[in-house]
């Protein structure tokens, strides 16, 4: 069963800036979102729970250097996209 991706306003702005700066990652970005929508537990996504001040959130790898932070709501089959950027940017 596919999950619905919910683009928060913050994520929309961040993704737009990110893709403008990293045009070479546009295809990878789309592929990761497609995989996330179909199976968030796909091993290639490297989904992992966050801790500390990000408790309750998860992250998936876009590349080795870049992450997408999200809130996974499995009861409603919703995935709330929160942030995208480098490791340091998204975990600030």
Regions found by a protein language model. Name each.
Residues 4-5, 43:
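Residues that recognize and position ribonucleotide moieties
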Residues 17-18, 35:
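Short alpha-helical scaffold segments that flank and stabilize functional sites
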Residues 34-60:
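A short, surface-exposed loop/turn module that caps and links secondary-structure elements
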């Amino acid at each position: 069963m596919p999950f619905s991706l919910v683009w928060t306003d913050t994520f929309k702005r961040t993704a737009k800036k990110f893709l403008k700066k990293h045009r070479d990652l546009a295809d990878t970005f789309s592929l990761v979102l497609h995989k996330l929508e179909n199976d968030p537990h796909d091993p290639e996504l490297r989904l992992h729970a966050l801790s500390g001040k990000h408790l309750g959130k998860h992250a998936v790898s876009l590349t080795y250097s870049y992450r997408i932070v999200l809130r996974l709501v499995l009861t409603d089959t919703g995935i709330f996209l929160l942030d995208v950027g480098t490791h340091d940017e998204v975990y600030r």
